[in-house]
Swiss-Prot record:
It is an enzyme of class 7 (translocase). InterPro entries: Helicase_ATP-bd, P-loop_NTPase, Rhodanese-like_dom, SEC_C_motif, SecA, SecA_CS, SecA_DEAD, SecA_motor_DEAD. The gene is secA. This is Protein translocase subunit SecA. GO terms for biological process: intracellular protein transmembrane transport; protein import; protein targeting; protein transport by the Sec complex. Gene3D superfamilies: 3.10.450.50, Helical scaffold and wing domains of SecA (1.10.3060.10), P-loop containing nucleotide triphosphate hydrolases (3.40.50.300), SecA, preprotein cross-linking domain (3.90.1440.10). It comes from Rhizobium johnstonii (strain DSM 114642 / LMG 32736 / 3841). ATP binds at residues 89, 107-111, 502. The lineage of its organism: Bacteria, Pseudomonadati, Pseudomonadota, Alphaproteobacteria, Hyphomicrobiales. Part of the Sec protein translocase complex. Interacts with the SecYEG preprotein conducting channel. Has a central role in coupling the hydrolysis of ATP to the transfer of proteins into and across the cell membrane, serving both as a receptor for the preprotein-SecB complex and as an ATP-driven molecular motor driving the stepwise translocation of polypeptide chains across the membrane. It catalyses: ATP + H2O + cellular proteinSide 1 = ADP + phosphate + cellular proteinSide 2. Its main location: membrane. One of its GO terms (cellular component) is cytosol.
C-alpha cells in the first residue's frame, strides 16, 4: 500500500528535488552568458576579478554577482584544466554557497565544484578555507585548482605539517587556503597561546568548505585537538601493573564490547588487591578506597589495553611505537595518542618504550572549531544518513545533487554465512572468478588483521597477483587506489583507505604520467609517450567495461551505513557499470554484538548447511535496523558530549577574546588598577565582617594579606585601634598605599617598560591559571556522572560547578597579577658562565601528537640554550640570554631592552 507521503512525493517531488529545482533559473542564466564569456580574452577574463571586487565595494552582495562569477570560473576551468563544470556541478556550487552540504556521488567532480563558491566568496577579501582530510589531498587540490585561481588573479596557499609560522602566516593571508582539519585546529590553539598579535598566523574564520564533511564533522567530532605538556615519568608503574593482567582468568573481569567497557569482578578485585598489596602499591584496605583513585585508573587502563584493544585492528606497532588506526578509514594516525594514560597502558602491553603522560594546555573539538566560521559548507558522497546530526549541531542542510549520468551499479543483497571460514572461502571463489573475467575487484575489509588474513588465504590458493592497501602501506595509498580500475586488478583495502582518490576504469592518466614520465622533459618524446599512455588506458577501460566495471566486495558490514555506502560508491562512477555485494557471517562483530543468536537459530531451523549462504532482502533490512540503532546511539553520545563541551567552549571564548584584547592593547594600566582595587575590596570584606565591631575585625589577617599580596608592611593593627575608624577608611588607606607604591615603581620603570611588564604578567598568569582550570574541568567531568545516583542532573551540576570554578579563576587572576606586579623589579643581569646546552625535547600531544611548546610563567634560568632550541613564544625555553643578544621573542630588540629589562622576583 502506497502511503499518502509517497503519493505526495510523486506529485510534488521531495523537498530535496524542490531545492535542486530552485537553482535551475541560475543555471539557465549562467548557460545563457557562456558564449559571451568564452569570447573574452585571457586578460579580459582575469580582469573580471577586479570588476567583481569593485561591485562588492559599491554595495553589491555575493548573490548579486553569483551568475557572472560562476560563468567566469567555468570558462577559466575549461581553459586551464580542460574541464567544463556540468550543470549539476553548478548546482553543487550553489548549494555550497548557500551554507549547506552537497551530497555528490563518487566521481562527480567535487573538487572542481568547490572552485565555484570558493572563487565567489574569496572576492570578499576575507579568505576562504578549503578543508581536506590529509596533507596529500590538500597539496594535490591546491596545486591543481590553484592554477584556476591564479589564472583569475587570486592567490592560493596550502597548510601542511611542518611549516614555519612565517609560511603559515603567508598561506593564511592568501585569498584561498587549503588545509587539513588538524592543522587548522592546531593553528587556532597555537595562535591563542601567542603573546604578540603579529605572531598569530590565522586571520579569522570567514568561510570554510569541508571536503569529506562526514568524516571530519561526524566521525572525528568527538576527537579533541589537544596541545599538552609532559607530566612526571610513571613508566615503571605501568609496567608493574601490566604484568598483573595476564595472571587473571575470564571470571576475574567483565567485558562489554557494545559499550566498549571493561570492569573487574569481585574475584578479580580481590586478586588485584593481593598483588598490589605485595608490591606496596595499595593504600588502606581496599582497591576502591579514595586514596587509591590513581591506581584504579591504572589497572582499568591495563585491563582495557589487554581485553578491549586489539593489535592490527585498533592499533599497530611500528618502529617501536604504538600507532592508532582510524576505525573509520583504516588509516594510521601517527603521533595521535589516546589520552588519560590509555596509550601508555598499550605501550606497556606491547613492551615498547613508554612515553610520558601529558597535561592539557589547550584543547578544542572539531565541533566547536568549525562552528566558529561565519559561513560553513561541506561536500561528501554520503551524508543523508547523518542529516539530522548536521542539522541539529551545525545548522547545515544536506542536499543530494543529481548525478550527471544515471548510476548503472548493481547493488546485490547480502550473503550471510554461519562462520568466518565459510564466508572467506566464498569471497575468494568470487574474487578469482571475477579475475578470470578480467573484472577489476576492490575488496573492503574493516581491519588490517582481516585484510592480511584474506591476502594470506589468496596466497595459499597459489594466487599473489593483488595489492593490499591498509595502514601499513599508507605511503602508496593514492597510487594503489588509482590503479584499482585496471582490468583484472585485485585490491584489498581497509574500509575507506584511499578516500579522496578516484578509481577510474582503465587507470588514472595523471598519476601514470607523473609516475612514468616525471623525469622526462617536455618535448616531442614526452608528448608521444603521453599519447601512448592515453591510448593504452582507453583500451584498458573498454576491457574493464566489457567485464562489468568495478566489482566492490565487502567482507562485513560496518556499524555505520554511511561507511558501507562509501565503499559501494567507489563503483559506478560517472555512469560506468559496476557491482557491489556484502559477504557476512554470524561471527562478524556487528552480527555477534547485535543479536546473531536469534538469527543463528533461525538459520538452523531453515536447514542451512555448511558452506551455504542465505540471501534475502529481509536480512538486509534487519542489518540496517541494527546499524540505525548504533548510529542513533553514537549520535546521542556526540550530542551529549557537545553539551558538556559547550560549557568549556563558552569559557574558552571569553578567555581567548580577553587574550586578544590584551595583545591588541599597548596600555592596560586601567585594567591593572581595577584588579588591584577589587583585590583590596575582597581583602577587606574577608577580614572585616559586615556590621562587626572593630574589636571583632581580623587585623592580623588583613596585615598578613597586605604583606603577601600587596608587598606592603602596613600598621593595620594600629589603624584598627583608632577612634571612629570604619571599614571604608581601612579600604581607602590600603588603596592609597598600594597606588602610591605602584606609581613610584612605574615612574622608576618608565611608561614603555611598565606597560610591557603589565601586559606580559597578566597574559602569562591568565595562561597559567587557564591551564589549571582545564585540568580541574577534566577532573570534574570524569566524576560528575556519579551525581546521577543522587537523583541530580549531571549536566546541570557540571554547569553550576564549572561556573564556580571559572569565577574562582577570575578571582585568582586578579590576586596573582596584583601580587606579581607589586613585587616585580628591574635587575641588572651579569653574563653567566657558559654551560652545556639544554637539549629541549618536543613533547607529544596525547590525542594528536603535535609537537608543541606552551608559554610558561617567565622565570630566570641559569642554563644556556642554543638559539635553535628556543621557542620565541615561551621564555621558559630560552635559558640564560646575554644582555646584548637579540631577544629570542622575535622583537628585534636587544635582550636588555626587551624581556631582559625585568624579572619577576
Amino acid at each position: 500500500m502506497v502511503s499518502f507521503g509517497g503519493i505526495a512525493r510523486k506529485l510534488f517531488g521531495s523537498s530535496n528535488d524542490r531545492r535542486v529545482r530552485s537553482y535551475q533559473p541560475n543555471v539557465t542564466a549562467i548557460n545563457s552568458i557562456e558564449e559571451k564569456t568564452k569570447a573574452l580574452t585571457d586578460e579580459q577574463l582575469a580582469a573580471k576579478t577586479v570588476e567583481f571586487r569593485a561591485l562588492l565595494a559599491e554595495g553589491k552582495t555575493l548573490d548579486d554577482i553569483l551568475i557572472p562569477a560562476f560563468a567566469v570560473v567555468r570558462e577559466a576551468s575549461r581553459r586551464v584544466l580542460g574541464l567544463r563544470p556540468f550543470d549539476v556541478q553548478l548546482v553543487g556550487g550553489m548549494i555550497l554557497h548557500s551554507n549547506a552540504i552537497a551530497e555528490m556521488k563518487t566521481g562527480e567532480g567535487k573538487t572542481l565544484v568547490a572552485t565555484l563558491p570558493v572563487y565567489l566568496n574569496a572576492l570578499s577579501g576575507k579568505g576562504v578555507h578549503v578543508v581536506t582530510v590529509n596533507d596529500y589531498l590538500a597539496q594535490r587540490d591546491a596545486a591543481t585548482m590553484g592554477r584556476v585561481y591564479g589564472f583569475l588573479g587570486m592567490t592560493t596557499g596550502v597548510i601542511v605539517h611542518g611549516l614555519s609560522d612565517e609560511e603559515r602566516h603567508a598561506a593564511y593571508a592568501c585569498d584561498i587556503t587549503y588545509a587539513t582539519n588538524n592543522e587548522l585546529g592546531f593553528d587556532y590553539l597555537r595562535d591563542n597561546m601567542k603573546y604578540e598579535k603579529n605572531q598569530m598566523v590565522q586571520r579569522g574564520h570567514n568561510f570554510a568548505i569541508v571536503d569529506e564533511v562526514d568524516s571530519i564533522l561526524v566521525d572525528e567530532a568527538r576527537t579533541p585537538l589537544i596541545i599538552s605538556g609532559p607530566l612526571d615519568d610513571r613508566s615503571e608503574l605501568y609496567n608493574t601493573i601490566d604484568a598483573y593482567i595476564p595472571l587473571l582468568v575470564p571470571s576475574d573481569y567483565e567485558i562489554d564490547e557494545k559499550q566498549r567497557s571493561a570492569n573487574f569482578s569481585e574475584e578479580g578485585t580481590e586478586k588485584l588487591e593481593n598483588l598490589l598489596r605485595q608490591a606496596g602499591l595499595l593504600k588502606g584496605n581496599a582497591l576502591y578506597d579514595i586514596e587509591n583513585v590513581a591506581i584504579v585508573h591504572h589497572v582499568n587502563n591495563a585491563l582495557k589495553a589487554h581485553k578491549l584493544f586489539q593489535r592490527d585492528k585498533d592499533y599497530i606497532v611500528r618502529n617501536d611505537e604504538v600507532v592508532i588506526i582510524d576505525e573509520f578509514t583504516g588509516r594510521m594516525m601517527p603521533g595521535r595518542r589516546y589520552s588519560e594514560g590509555q596509550h601508555q597502558a598499550l605501550e606497556a602491553k606491547e613492551k615498547v618504550q613508554i612515553q610520558p603522560e601529558n597535561q592539557t594546555l589547550a584543547s578544542i573539538t572539531f565541533q566547536n572549531y568549525f562552528r566558529m566560521y561565519d559561513k560553513l559548507a561541506g561536500m561528501t558522497g554520503t551524508a543523508q544518513t547523518e542529516a539530522e546530526e548536521f542539522a541539529n549541531i551545525y545548522n547545515l542542510d544536506v542536499i543530494e545533487v543529481p548525478t550527471n549520468l544515471p548510476i548503472k551499479r548493481l547493488d546485490e543483497d547480502d550473503e550471510v554465512y554461519r562462520t568466518f571460514d565459510e564466508k572467506f572461502k566464498a569471497i575468494i571463489e568470487e574474487i578469482l572468478d571475477a579475475h578470470k573475467r578480467g573484472q577489476p575487484v576492490l575488496v573492503g575489509t574493516t581491519s588490517i588483521e582481516k585484510s592480511e588474513l584474506l591476502a594470506e588465504r589468496l596466497r595459499k590458493q597459489g594466487f599473489d597477483d593483488f595489492k593490499v592497501l591498509n595502514a601499513r602501506y599508507h605511503e602508496q595509498e593514492a597510487y594503489i587506489v588509482a590503479q584499482a580500475g585496471v582490468p583484472g586488478a585485485i585490491t584489498i583495502a581497509t574500509n575507506m583507505a584511499g578516500r579522496g582518490t578516484d578509481i577510474q576504469l582503465g587507470g588514472n592518466l595523471d598519476m601514470r604520467i607523473e609516475r612514468e614520465l616525471g623525469e622526462v622533459e617536455a618535448g616531442p618524446e614526452r608528448d608521444a609517450r603521453i599519447q601512448a599512455i592515453i591510448e593504452e588506458i582507453k583500451e584498458l577501460k573498454q576491457k574493464a567495461l566489457d567485464a562489468g566495471g568495478l566489482y566492490v566486495i565487502a567482507t562485513e558490514r560496518h556499524e555505520s551505513r554511511r561507511i558501507d555506502n562509501q565503499l559501494r560508491g567507489r563503483s559506478g562512477r560517472q555512469g560506468d557499470p559496476g557491482r557491489s555485494k556484502f559477504y557476512l557471517s554470524l561471527q562478524d562483530d556487528l552480527m555477534r554484538i547485535f543479536g546473531s543468536d536469534r538469527m543463528d537459530s533461525m538459520l538452523t531451523k531453515l536447514g542451512l548447511k555448511e558452506g551455504e549462504a542465505i540471501v534475502h532482502p529481509w536480512i538486509n533490512k534487519a542489518l540496517e535496523r541494527a546499524q540505525k540503532k548504533v548510529e542513533a546511539r553514537n549520535f546521542d553520545i556526540r550530542k551529549n558530549l557537545l553539551k558538556y563541551d559547550d560549557v568549556l567552549n563558552d569559557q574558552r571564548k571569553v578567555v581567548f577574546e580577553q587574550r586578544l584584547e590584551l595583545m591588541e592593547s599597548t596600555n592596560i594600566s586601567e585594567t591593572v588598577s581595577d584588579m588591584r582595587r577589587e583585590v583590596i575590596e575582597d581583602m577587606v570584606e574577608k577580614h572585616i565582617p559586615e556590621r562587626a565591631y572593630a574589636e571583632q575585625w581580623d587585623a592580623a589577617g588583613l596585615k598578613t594579606g597586605a604583606l603577601n599580596i600587596l608587598n606592603l608592611d602596613l600598621p593595620v593593627e594600629d589603624w584598627v585601634k583608632e577612634e571612629g575608624i570604619g571599614e571604608d577608611d581601612i579600604r581607602e588607606r590600603l588603596t592609597e598605599a598600594a597606588n602610591a607604591a605602584f606609581t613610584e615603581k612605574a615612574e622608576r620603570f618608565g611608561d614603555d617598560i611598565m606597560h610591557y611588564v603589565e601586559r606580559s604578567i597578566v597574559m602569562q598568569t591568565l595562561d597559567h591559571l587557564w591551564r589549571e582550570h582545564i585540568v580541574n574541568l577534566d577532573h570534574l567531568r570524569s566524576v560528575i556522572g556519579f551525581r546521577g545516583y543522587a537523583q541530580r542532573d549531571p549536566l546541570q551540576e557540571y554547569k553550576s560547578e564549572a561556573f564556580e570554578l571559572f569565577t574562582a579563576l577570575l578571582n585568582n587572576l586578579r590576586e596573582a597579577v596584583t601580587a606579581q606586579l607589586m613585587r616585580v623589579e628591574l635587575v641588572q643581569q651579569a653574563p653567566a658562565e657558559p654551560e652545556p646546552p639544554l637539549m629541549q625535547a618536543h613533547h607529544l600531544d596525547p590525542t594528536t601528537g603535535e609537537d608543541d611548546f606552551a608559554p610558561a610563567i617567565y622565570q630566570a634560568s641559569e642554563v644556556i640554550v642554543s638559539p635553535e632550541n628556543r621557542n620565541p613564544d615561551d621564555p621558559a625555553t630560552w635559558g640564560k640570554v646575554g644582555r646584548n643578544e637579540t631577544c629570542p621573542c622575535g622583537s628585534g630588540k636587544k635582550y636588555k631592552h626587551c624581556h631582559g629589562a625585568f624579572e619577576q622576583v
